[in-house]
Every structure is written in structure tokens, then in C-alpha cells.
Amino acid sequence: MELAAGSFSEEQFWEACAELQQPALAGADWQLLVETSGISIYRLLDKKTGLYEYKVFGVLEDCSPTLLADIYMDSDYRKQWDQYVKELYEQECNGETVVYWEVKYPFPMSNRDYVYLRQRRDLDMEGRKIHVILARSTSMPQLGERSGVIRVKQYKQSLAIESDGKKGSKVFMYYFDNPGGQIPSWLINWAAKNGVPNFLKDMARACQNYLKKT
């Protein structure tokens, strides 16, 4: 579903496109964190929280851009391939499509939940088709906080996808997430370092399984 105009600016979509073509890593202290399976992950310290913002660049082979974007937007299918999803659904709030997402955390930590806006645009950049998906946390009275679950108030993600010229997808992803609570920042950063590449690998695997089903 398309969100109402105004959830994200035109400029934000084109910024994600631009990063896919030319990574914007200069002028800030972005550090190369890890390179694995054709994926490079950079991080930048957010001094206010002690947490890191992440930028991911790479290629997912044998997974077409359109299919990858469709799978990312398919909340029902994500419940099948993402083992950390406790609850995930879309709801109309004030004329906009809002996503509610509860994530399983290991005991004894409380689960986290998110309420966020998400929008997809398929753009034409000099004849190249680029799928861009933007997401950011929001608050809606209709989706209030739940007892025993910690609401994530700071969440932002950008995803830009185009063909790698073969059967795969060239991908750029930006990610920032502050899970709140009493989890030490070093543990959050350790989890993100592993979780970000694993998420992309899981999504690539979901592409393969989806193709087998159809």
C-alpha cells in the first residue's frame, strides 16, 4: 500500500537512490565494520545515544530487485521467514498506512515493538529502475504502548535496490534503531553488527524460497 503523500519527501527518496550509485561516506567518521559475502557494512557513532547508524552496500545474487522489494513489503510472508517476528500487521491511521511490529527478544529481556510509517517508490534514474523503501518510527494513539513490551521510539531505515546487471540485486541500506530499556550500548552494537548482515542473508533466502513456492 502507498502511504499518503507527505510521509516522506521526494528528496529523501532521491537521496537513497544517490547512495546506491555513490556511497556518501566522506565528511563524517564512517568506519568500515565488516565485509562478508559481498556485503560491506559501515557505521557512524551517534554521540547522543552511544549507538551506531549503519550503511550497508553490496549485491544479493540470484534475487531480482522487484522480488526483493516485494518481499520486503510483504508483512504476511515476513512472518514465515523472520524468526524474530512476534506480531506484524498494517493498519490505517489518520489516512496513512502504519505498520505495527513486535520483535522477540531473548529472555530475560522484554520484547520490543515498533509503530512506523513505510513507503515504497519505484523510480526511474536515467533509464535504470530503482526501488526505494523508506521507514521511520511514529506515534499513533490507536496503537498505544503495551504492558511488558518496550516501545522503540527511534527507528529509521532506507532501502534502495536495482539490478546488478545479472540475475541479482545491488543494494543500499541505512539503518538506525534505539531499542531503549536497560540494555548496555555495547550489547546493542554487537547485536546490530551481526543482525544487519544476517537480515540481508535471511531476505535473500526468503527470495529463493518464494521462487520455489510460485
From Swiss-Prot:
The modification Phosphoserine is found at residue 139. A 1,2-diacyl-sn-glycero-3-phosphocholine binds at residues 72, 78, 157. One of its GO terms (cellular component) is cytosol. Pfam families: START. Catalyzes the transfer of phosphatidylcholine between membranes. Binds a single lipid molecule. Highest expression in liver, placenta, testis, kidney and heart. Low levels in brain and lung. No expression detected in thymus. The gene is PCTP. Residues 1-212 form the START domain. It is found in: Cytoplasm. One of its GO terms (molecular function) is phosphatidylcholine binding. The modification N-acetylmethionine is found at residue 1. This is Phosphatidylcholine transfer protein. InterPro entries: STARD2_START (IPR041950), START-like_dom_sf (IPR023393), START_lipid-bd_dom (IPR002913), START_lipid_transfer (IPR051213). It comes from Homo sapiens. GO terms for biological process: lipid transport; negative regulation of cold-induced thermogenesis; phospholipid transport. Interacts with ACOT13/THEM2. Keywords: Acetylation, Cytoplasm, Lipid transport, Lipid-binding, Phosphoprotein, Transport.
